[in-house]
Regions:
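Short, glycine/serine-rich, charged loops/turns that create anion-binding
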Residues: 23-25, 82, 104-105, 144
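Short, well-ordered secondary-structure micro-motifs
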Residues: 28-30, 64-69, 86-90, 110-112, ...
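A short acidic, often aromatic-flanked loop/helix-cap motif at beta-alpha or helix-coil junctions
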Residues: 60-66, 83-85, 130
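Glycine- and other small-residue-rich loops at beta-strand/loop junctions that grip anionic moieties
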Residues: 54, 104, 128, 132
């Protein structure tokens, strides 16, 4: 997770919400670990000359995630074999994006149903099965690139 925090901050993600999933391989981190992630995000922001540090939130469960997504945010759940994330973003023209990346075992059926009921859009990152770290950083890269393209065209954009 340290690697994801550091690299997502360097790529310009504005927030990271650690998600506790049914198939997650790791228990929810403690206060010390979250403080470490926040320090890593701050250091990465300085290193990448970002104007602001990524906000690392305390871990939250799936139901809390769904309740926390602002209505104006494009909420996406990534899964293998779905429509490409880049296409989903281009079609939606979002100002902000929340991208849920599953654990190594992927999201379970109940989690998928909850996100579907909450209006999350399903998107993929290509045909290969990716580790969570790779998926998270690939998704941030895609989203940031497309949001910055939108900014260049006069639209206001922010990534979560």
């Amino acid at each position: 997770m340290d690697f994801i925090v550091e690299k997502a901050a360097e790529l310009g993600a504005s927030e990271l919400w650690p998600l506790v999933c049914a198939r997650g391989l790791v228990h929810a981190p403690g206060v010390e670990r979250i403080a470490r992630w926040r320090r890593l995000a701050l250091a990465a922001a300085k290193q990448s000359q970002s104007s602001s540090a990524m906000n690392v939130r305390a871990p939250l469960g799936f139901d809390d995630l769904i309740r926390s997504v602002p209505r104006t945010t494009l909420a996406v759940i990534c899964t293998q074999g779905a429509e490409p994330l880049s296409r989903v973003i281009r079609r939606a023209h979002p100002r902000a994006i929340l991208i849920a990346i599953g654990p190594e075992g992927d999201f379970d059926n109940a989690e998928r149903a909850k996100t579907s009921d909450a209006g999350f859009v399903v998107a993929g990152l290509g045909p290969n099965r990716l580790r969570s770290e790779t998926a998270a950083l690939g998704a941030v890269s895609i989203a940031q690139g497309l949001l910055h393209d939108a900014e260049g065209s006069g639209e206001d954009a922010e990534s979560e």
